[in-house]
């Protein structure tokens, strides 16, 4: 039976039915290693392989309905003159294809550019901020009800509840002695931060790690990719998650993370230069809090996952278990949160100065 199933796959692990669904003859398929969620391929078509597109096997955490959202938002972005990948319909005029094995596939137009795994320089942060501001500005007045709702993604109360439950249920876990005091610190720090509730809910990308931004070879922002996470959210939460990632030069895999105010200032300058100054005064004021809140939220989530041994991308080469890897990630984020805590006044001053001056 296994041999029969494999007969339907190409050398790249793509069922022939997928190529047929999109009407592709003799495609040249190359695996793109970047990304942990969806399996991504570069497809070259035509006699000289001159026509390129992206093919993705969509992770089961996303249902087919997400493609209605991607199509609607990218259509709007295109109408506003922004560069964006667009979904390619099947020969049956559908936005996705479900293969005979139950896997969900989609194809998208190819956008020339490159991405980065980390923000190596303040200059890159400037271009990233400018690109994100253009996106936020373009969807500012777009009225749309998402079919794929991402509920509880940044629900701090829910994440802390899960952490408390994990501590109660896993007190026998080999890492409990290390996790418990860190969890207490996370809870105490979060309890002292201003609430982000009540801020305007706006359409956002939802996952602005630097690898989800495309740049030209000259370093200019081109477009946002990986649009499965489109949702309504507050801008300080969106930017908080972005700046948490961009402004950590040591990378998220470092145990001793330090927040770079230089990277932050350039990211904000880029955001303002890209048209981001339209957000409200309360949103501007909440940006530094958003960074610290999301950093602590991730710490809580990783501590929970350490006790639950939950990590689909566990690095078996460097960690003896998923728990150990998650504990390392939690320590990295908590280190970053401590750095942020010590720079609150500086971050607040930088934020107000840049938005006031409009630079």
Regions found by a protein language model. Give the residues of each.
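Active-site catalytic-loop/activation-segment of kinase and kinase-like phosphoryl-transfer enzymes
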Residues: 2-6, 148-194
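Juxta-kinase regulatory segment immediately upstream of eukaryotic protein kinase catalytic domains
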Residues: 2-30
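Conserved ATP-binding subdomain of kinase catalytic cores across diverse folds
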Residues: 31-46, 50-53, 58-161, 235, ...
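Active-site acidic catalytic loop and adjacent metal/ATP-binding pocket
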Residues: 36-50, 54-55, 87, 188-237, ...
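Secondary-structure capping and boundary motifs in well-ordered enzyme cores
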Residues: 100, 124, 200, 205, ...
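ATP/Mg2+ or Mg2+-diphosphate-binding catalytic cores
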Residues: 166, 297-359
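Active-site activation/catalytic loop segments of kinase-like enzymes and analogous catalytic loops
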Residues: 236-277, 293-313
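Small/polar glycine-rich anion-binding or flexible loop at a beta-alpha turn
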Residues: 284-294, 320
């Amino acid at each position: 039976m296994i041999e029969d199933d494999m007969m339907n796959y190409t050398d790249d692990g793509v069922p022939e039915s997928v190529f047929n669904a999109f009407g592709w003859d003799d495609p040249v398929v190359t695996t793109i290693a970047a990304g942990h969620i969806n399996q991504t391929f570069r497809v070259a078509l035509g006699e000289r392989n001159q026509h390129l597109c992206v093919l993705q096997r969509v992770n089961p955490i996303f249902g087919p309905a997400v493609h209605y959202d991607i199509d609607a938002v990218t259509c709007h972005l295109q109408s506003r003159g922004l560069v964006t990948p667009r979904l390619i319909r099947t020969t049956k005029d559908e936005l996705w294809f479900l293969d005979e094995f139950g896997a969900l596939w989609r194809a998208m137009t190819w956008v020339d550019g490159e991405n980065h795994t980390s923000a190596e320089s303040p200059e890159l942060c400037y271009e990233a901020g400018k690109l994100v501001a253009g996106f936020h500005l373009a969807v500012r007045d777009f009225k749309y009800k998402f079919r794929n709702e991402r509920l509880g993604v940044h629900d701090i109360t829910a994440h802390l509840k899960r952490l408390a439950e994990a501590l109660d249920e896993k007190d026998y876990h080999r890492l409990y002695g290390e996790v418990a005091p860190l969890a207490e610190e996370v809870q105490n720090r979060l309890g002292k931060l201003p609430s982000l509730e009540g801020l305007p809910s706006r359409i956002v990308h939802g996952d602005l790690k630097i690898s989800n931004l495309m740049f030209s070879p000259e370093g200019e922002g081109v477009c946002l990719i990986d649009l499965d996470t489109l949702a309504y959210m507050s801008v300080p939460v969106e930017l908080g998650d972005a700046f948490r990632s961009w402004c950590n030069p040591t990378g998220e895999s470092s145990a001793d993370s330090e927040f770079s105010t230089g990277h932050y200032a350039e990211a904000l300058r880029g955001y303002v230069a890209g048209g981001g100054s339209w957000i409200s005064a309360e949103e501007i004021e909440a940006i530094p809090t958003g960074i610290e809140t999301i950093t602590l939220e991730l710490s809580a989530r990783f501590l929970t996952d350490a006790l639950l041994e939950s990590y689909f991308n566990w690095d078996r080469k460097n960690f003896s278990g998923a728990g150990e890897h998650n504990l390392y990630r939690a320590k990295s984020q908590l280190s970053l949160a401590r750095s942020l805590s010590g720079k609150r006044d500086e971050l607040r001053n930088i934020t107000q100065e840049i938005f006031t001056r409009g630079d």
